[in-house]
């Protein structure tokens, strides 16, 4: 990504300078101070991007003085399981300063990372393996990338011990021992001249050794890559551009060895030994759109076993020449764009973590640009992007190459403001359609004549003869180049003859230029002695490493046995799932863990039954007492109910008696009332007939009686007597 060079470290914005001048004029003798609030640029990237797009010249910034850090040189010894130990040294960056506190654990972890064969031939382990010649910082970077890709974890001081334990758990128990005559088994690396075996002593005492020395002198100089962080930017970007055009051998193989090897294991390649297209086993990744037709972008037959798999088949015998996993850009690009803004991991990040070379079609590039989600799709450090999946299609049409290169330079927000016309021309030009139509006419040409463009032995000239002179008639240009390509089958034979002639010339020169071959005999004998001594030391070192590995295995076994003995005799009823995870963390064998958990389950069941029986026995007495009390209370309740029924009967009898008495009393009262009425009537008749004076009724004087006036006058008139 291009860097913004609008301001240097001491540059002052124009508006700020004008404001300072005006303040000096208004207040002489005083030093002007900026009233613009300081902004931390590391946390204001969106503000800076917006200011650049709008062409603003006034951007507040803050100058931070970074203190100097005294970094010491640290040396570590890495002991791979399948080769000899080697030392790496260098300084540790301040961001990884916490590693100084755990150097022994770091050496232990690096031993596993330097032994990719311990992880069941994982491609990720091979890609991030630590090799001799690396600097310490490059080895730490490889270790961090290994942890991120294999364990999906981030290296921190808090979880460093957990990471080391997890790496040991993943590593296979079988450790391969390096033999004296180790050979590289990867036929692809040997085929493409990318073998980087360790240095070996060459005996030049005979003609065979001299021929071998001459062969080594004629080969290109190859050195180990110092790591991505130390690659010259021009070399790195040149290599990415070559991969983009399907020209991996044109990149500097000192840095892109692994990527080139993966490329020729994925994409269609012509095998000169078998005389046909190689049968590829490794699968690649294609980012494409849902509506494009992939069959129109290759000269091979296209077979789709399922919705996510694409096979390229040879047109002669239908064997598989390339395998790809198809991923639709519409499904992953929007989510990846949102994940970048939120700082999360996307599906596309997981796909990129498992490969080094990917393919993206021209239509997919245009789709991400059109929808504004192109950031982080092609500009990745850990993958090399190839436009298209058929090398011949990309080499002949160049569809999408310019657009992909533009997206590798800047983010889309910057391109929309600074390179809008260029972006418009790449999105709306009709040249891609014309080249695509011309390529369809190529499919009708001879299939055998096109095989030379998939021949890896053409080295840097791979694909260069296509369209050397571009004419207005694209179809005629393709036909001319196809006619010329039919003469390229003799090139490998001629190159082999040239190499043999060079070997003969060098051998003759070495023999003729040696005036005193006898003088070299002592040196050669000394060289042979040193070689035998080195071989003996290597064998002793190998035996020592084997004994050391056996001792470490015995120690681990003893620790495991002691722990197993304790766990077997320890009585516990804890059968929680977390307990099984803790036993797994201390590396207890799965069968032992299963036996322990089953035993705990049985003990827990026994204790539950025992506690149930004791509780039942203790509660039985109380239950009996309560039962007896319940019986007594039931009897009392029965007696009370009988008494209540008896009382109810008595009450009913009393009520009946009272009712009868009331009736009797009522009758008697009615009789008395009637009798009273009768007597009253009789009294009235007698009163009318007899006049009774008060003096006759009482001997008491009338005056001495109170309320005499209220008394009834019973006097009877005398005339009625």
Swiss-Prot record:
A Gene Ontology molecular function term of the record: RNA binding
Subunit: Interacts with mu-2. Interacts with sigma-NS; in viral factories. Interacts with the inner capsid proteins lambda-1 and sigma-2, and outer capsid protein lambda-2; in viral factories.
Region of interest called Interaction with sigma-NS, as start-end residue ranges on this chain: 1-13
GO terms under cellular component: host cell cytoplasm
Ranges where the record places region Involved in the formation of factory-like inclusions: 471-721
Coiled coil: 522-559, 628-684
Protein known as: Protein mu-NS
């Amino acid at each position: 990504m291009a860097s913004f060079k609008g301001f240097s470290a001491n540059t002052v914005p124009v508006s700020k300078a004008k404001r300072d001048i005006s303040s000096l004029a208004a207040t002489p003798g005083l030093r002007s101070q900026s009233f613009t609030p300081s902004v931390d640029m590391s946390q204001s990237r969106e503000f800076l991007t917006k200011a650049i797009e709008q062409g603003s010249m006034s951007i507040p910034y803050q100058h931070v003085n970074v203190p100097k850090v005294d970094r010491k040189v640290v040396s570590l010894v890495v002991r791979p399981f399948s080769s000899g130990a080697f030392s790496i040294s260098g300084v540790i960056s301040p961001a990884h300063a916490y590693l100084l506190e755990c150097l022994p654990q770091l050496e232990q972890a690096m031993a596993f990372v330097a032994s990719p064969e311990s992880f069941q031939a994982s491609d990720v382990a091979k890609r991030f393996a630590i090799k001799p010649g690396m600097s310490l910082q490059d080895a730490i970077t490889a270790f961090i990338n290994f942890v991120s890709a294999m364990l999906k974890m981030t290296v921190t001081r808090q979880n460093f011990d957990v990471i080391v334990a997890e790496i040991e758990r993943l590593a296979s128990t079988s450790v391969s021992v390096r033999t004296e005559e180790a050979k590289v088994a990867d036929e692809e690396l040997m085929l493409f001249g990318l073998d980087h075996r360790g240095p070996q002593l060459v005996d030049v005492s005979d003609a065979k050794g001299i021929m071998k020395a001459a062969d080594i002198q004629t080969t290109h100089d190859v050195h180990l890559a110092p790591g991505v962080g130390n690659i010259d930017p021009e070399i790195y970007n040149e290599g990415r551009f070559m991969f983009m055009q399907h020209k991996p051998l044109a990149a500097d193989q000192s840095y892109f060895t692994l990527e080139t090897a993966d490329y020729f294991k994925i994409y269609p390649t012509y095998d000169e030994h078998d005389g046909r297209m190689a049968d590829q086993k490794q699968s690649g990744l294609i980012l494409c759109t849902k509506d494009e037709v992939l069959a129109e972008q290759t000269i091979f037959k296209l077979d789709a076993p399922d919705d996510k798999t694409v096979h390229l088949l040879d047109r002669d015998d239908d064997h598989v020449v390339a395998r790809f996993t198809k991923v639709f850009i519409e499904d992953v690009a929007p989510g990846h764009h949102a994940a970048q803004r939120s700082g999360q991991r996307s599906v596309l990040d997981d796909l990129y973590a498992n490969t080094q070379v990917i393919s993206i079609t021209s239509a997919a590039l245009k789709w991400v640009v059109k929808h504004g989600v192109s950031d982080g799709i092609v500009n990745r450090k850990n993958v090399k992007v190839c436009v298209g999946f058929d090398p011949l299609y990309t080499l002949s049409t160049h569809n999408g190459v310019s657009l992909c290169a533009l997206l590798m330079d800047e983010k889309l927000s910057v391109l929309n403001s600074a390179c809008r016309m260029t972006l418009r021309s790449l999105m709306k030009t009709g040249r891609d359609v014309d080249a695509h139509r011309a390529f369809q006419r190529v499919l009708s040409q001879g299939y055998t004549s096109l095989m030379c463009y998939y021949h890896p032995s053409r080295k840097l000239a791979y694909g260069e003869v296509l369209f050397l002179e571009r004419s207005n008639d694209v179809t005629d240009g393709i036909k001319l180049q196809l006619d010329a390509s039919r003469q390229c089958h003799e090139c490998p034979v001629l190159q082999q003859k040239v190499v043999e002639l060079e070997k003969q010339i060098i051998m003759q020169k070495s023999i003729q230029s040696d005036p005193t071959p006898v003088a070299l005999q002592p040196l050669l004998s000394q060289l042979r002695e040193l070689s035998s001594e080195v071989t003996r030391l290597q064998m002793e070192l190998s035996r020592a490493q084997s004994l050391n590995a056996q001792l470490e295995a015995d120690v681990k076994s003893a620790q495991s046995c002691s722990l197993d003995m304790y766990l077997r005799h320890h009585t516990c009823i804890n059968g929680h799932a977390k307990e099984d995870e803790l036993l797994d963390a201390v590396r207890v064998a799965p069968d032992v863990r299963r036996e322990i958990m089953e035993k705990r389950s049985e003990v827990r069941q026994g204790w539950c039954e025992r506690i149930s029986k004791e509780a039942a026995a203790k509660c039985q007495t109380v239950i009996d007492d309560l039962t007896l009390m319940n019986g007594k209370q039931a009897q009392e309740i029965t007696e009370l109910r009988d008494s209540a029924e008896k009382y109810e009967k008595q009450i009913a009898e009393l009520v009946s008696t009272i009712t009868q008495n009331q009736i009797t009393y009522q009758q008697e009262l009615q009789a008395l009332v009637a009798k009273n009425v009768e007597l009253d009537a009789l009294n009235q008749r007698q009163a009318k007939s007899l006049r009774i004076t008060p003096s006759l009724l009482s001997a008491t004087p009338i005056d001495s009686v109170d309320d005499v006036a209220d008394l009834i006058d019973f006097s009877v008139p005398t005339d009625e007597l």
